[in-house]
Amino acid sequence: MAYCPFQFSPLAIFVLEELFVDDLLLQLNNISVVYSDVIQVLKGVSLAVEKNHIVSLLGSNGAGKTTTLKAISGLLKPENGRVTDGTILYRNGEIQNRAPETITRQGIIQVLEGRQPFKYLTIEENLRVGTATRWGNPYREDLEKVYHYFPALEKRKKGLAGYCSGGELQMLVMGRALMAHPELLLLDEPSLGLAPLVVREIFRIVRRINEEEGTTIILVEQNARMALQIAHYGYVMENGKIVMEGKAEALRENPDVREFYLGMSAAGTAKSYTDVKSYRRRKRWL
């Protein structure tokens, strides 16, 4: 056992532990998720999210990223899924398998992949839907805040959401989430199918929301390069397990992450898609 020159009193240890816990907003402790009592998707996933941080969750298709978000937000039940083992702690209270409306009222809001608006409502009407969990509260100020981050929405606020472009739809669903005053925002593949210029703008806004609103964000994203540029911390998932974690800057420099998710060789040169073999990734980590 290594010698430690410092000795702490029990009171000091308690205070240090409390300070550390107070910095954590969310903890997943060894959770497993099963669909239809048959298909196990998550196998002992543990992660921690500090307040006011952006945490990126990386991994290939089918790794379990979206299921992790749905376990947090309570959206497993509509898909006949449930957390069978482990605990999910939010503000130090257990929330696993709670009703999604209860979790939403606690301040956890998920922006689902796919950008599904109410097509026959206007953009502004769609945004007002985001206030459904806080009836009686004024919303005009919140609309102004959303338009501050997404000025393109204000220009078209009376137009039907069904006529929005992909980028406008992504802004709309993120704006609708902001209307609910999230403490923890779960973003699932915000860059999916968008042009590179739009992707850069979306990620710039995500960073601003984190910095200016103090919103804690978990970001599930295939675009690992962009995700790790704005994240504070990251986790890599493979086959329902966490196989790697670390500060974002450390993950950007990790040889495995560079090869399998950033498409870079050890020498720093770009690799073609055919050179990045998924079986090599699985063999190395599993």
Regions found by a protein language model. Give the residues of each.
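A short, proline-enriched helix->beta-strand linker immediately N-terminal to the Walker B motif
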Residues: M179-E183
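Helical segment within the ABC ATPase nucleotide-binding domain
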Residues: R200-G214
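Helix-to-loop junction immediately C-terminal to a conserved catalytic motif
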Residues: S73
